[in-house]
Amino acid sequence: MKVLVLFSVLFLTLFSYSSTEAIDEFDSDAEDDMLSLMANEQVRAKACTPRLHDCSHDRHSCCRGELFKDVCYCFYPEGEDKTEVCSCQQPKSHKYIEKVVDKAKTVVG
């Protein structure tokens, strides 16, 4: 009986060792495949429109500020013809929140 228990423990040890070898081999192949796919990946991000620049061509292209994304505001200037002018601007509420966060960072550390 002791011999049977000894052989079963030995068999289970060898089986678990061989299965982990196979799993490690499979994982390394999967990692190599993923790395080769990532190497072929192209950067798809388009250039953002800086603050206070014209965003009439794409109203969702404004750059991010420190915490929030700027918003494209459109308006009609006074005294000119009825052409719409759009520019990326930071909303006042976002500006105040960023100031509070900056003050909190300096106080905390």
From Swiss-Prot:
GO terms for cellular component: extracellular region. Expressed by the venom gland. Its main location: secreted. Disulfide bonds join 48-63, 55-72, 62-88, 74-86. It is found in: Secreted. Residues 45-88 are annotated as: Knottin domain. InterPro entries: Spider_toxin_CSTX_knottin, Spider_toxin_CSTX_Knottin_CS. Residues 89-108 are annotated as: Linear cationic cytotoxin domain. The keyword Disulfide bond applies. GO terms for molecular function: calcium channel regulator activity; toxin activity. Enhances the high-affinity desensitization of human P2RX3 purinoceptors. This is U4-lycotoxin-Ls1a.
